[in-house]
Amino acid sequence: MAVRGMKKNYSYLFGILTITVYLVGLLLINRGLGFTNVVVIACSMVIYYVANVYNMTGRYKLRDIVIIIAINFILVMITKFLKVFLLNEAIILFGLLTMFQIIYRYIVMIGLAEKKKIVFVGENGYTDDLLESIKKDSQYKLSGFLKEKKDINILTKKLLNLCENKKVDIIVDFTSNLLYDTKLVDKLLQYKLNGMQYYNYLEFYEMYENKLPVSNLSPKWFLENTGFEIYYNSFNLKAKRILDIIFALLIGICVIPIMIVAAIIIKLESKGPVFFIQERIGEGNKPFKIVKFRSMTTDAEKDGPKWATKNDNRVTKFGKFMRLTRIDELPQLWNVLRGEMSFVGPRPEREFFIKQLEKEIMYYNLRHTVKPGLTGWAQVMYPYGASIEDAYRKLQYDLYYIKNHDIIFDMKILLKTVTIVIFGKGR
């Protein structure tokens, strides 16, 4: 399986240690584990993730402490009302969890104080994007940017000088000829055996940005690279389909009251049908009818198809709320059950726009080699867009998803989608 992301991630360690503290708390107050506690632990892990408590990459703000305290208070009070603890026991557990998480995060941030030193060698169209990201990242420091174009030997000497002075932890190679020098390769290999990391810019861009540099990819790159198991891993595909059916049925039953209320409000707010049915292009370029709650006026496309924009006056008042919370997408659970869509995948587009985008964007057609989704990596990583440039940016994430797909990645995307819904970060 391909590597996803290279930024330090302490989520797993943080989760394991939080569970340990919870269990120690149970022992201190002489309580057994019990089924209820298992459920509370599992739910708390999910809630911490959704609330972004596990994110250790940014600066530690007062908001983070408030979120930790609030979540722990709610969780402990729930266990209190479930009669798992007495009040004084709940207070002990709350204190243990809160103090541990705050102290742990400070320890992690201190550990991140020693930044990884990165050297960029050469430059191309993606260098500036990566430079901006590195400058904002608390884990990394740009210790060199070597962009000598005329003489590769000068560039090589500068690079080796940085390595000898221990100013390099990571080399990112944007050139096409740096490794032609066999003597340089031998020396870099020795540094690598002592802990230095070397990446060509395509590898680094994918790992660091969690997307693919589409415009610099060639058919040869697709042929040689690992990943893309979504095309041939039958176990993952079957598991994905089974989970789609289970989730669609369970969620569908749970959201029936929400859908009924939404349908009534839509009908009361504006004239026209409750549902919006439109042809989209799915896997294998096969058209299918997508079903959504109508969020626009009935004459929204009287002048022809066009993308929705920010503050689009065609969107109804309740439609804005539905788009923020993704309620308008709920009827697509029917498309999932029918096998036309999956929970996770590239969002399906209309043929009218696809024809335009395939002319303008390289590899755009690859989106249609997999089943479209209710949500996707592009949707949780990039804001709603309404231009060819936005479509290109989203394709970078879509192809990254296709290359790195597995069930765990799907779960991560679904959890991020929950965050978007809860905090109203939709369109």
Q: What is the predicted function of each stretch?
A:
Residues I102-K115, I265-F275:
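Aromatic-capped interface at the extracytoplasmic side
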Residues F235-D299, N335, I407, K412-R427:
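A hydrophobic, helix-centered structural microdomain
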Residues M1-G111:
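Signature of alpha-helical transmembrane segments in polytopic membrane proteins
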Residues Y205, L212-P213, F276-R314, T375-K394, ...:
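Short, glycine-rich, amphipathic interfacial segments at transmembrane boundaries or analogous
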Residues A2-T18, R105-I253:
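N-terminal hydrophobic signal-anchor/signal peptide
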Residues R338, I361-R427:
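C-terminal terminal-structure detector
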Residues T309-K371, I413-T417, V421:
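A short, structured surface patch at a secondary-structure boundary
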Residues G125-I152, V291-N313, K317-G319:
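Acidic, Ser/Thr-rich low-complexity segments on the non-lumenal side of membrane proteins
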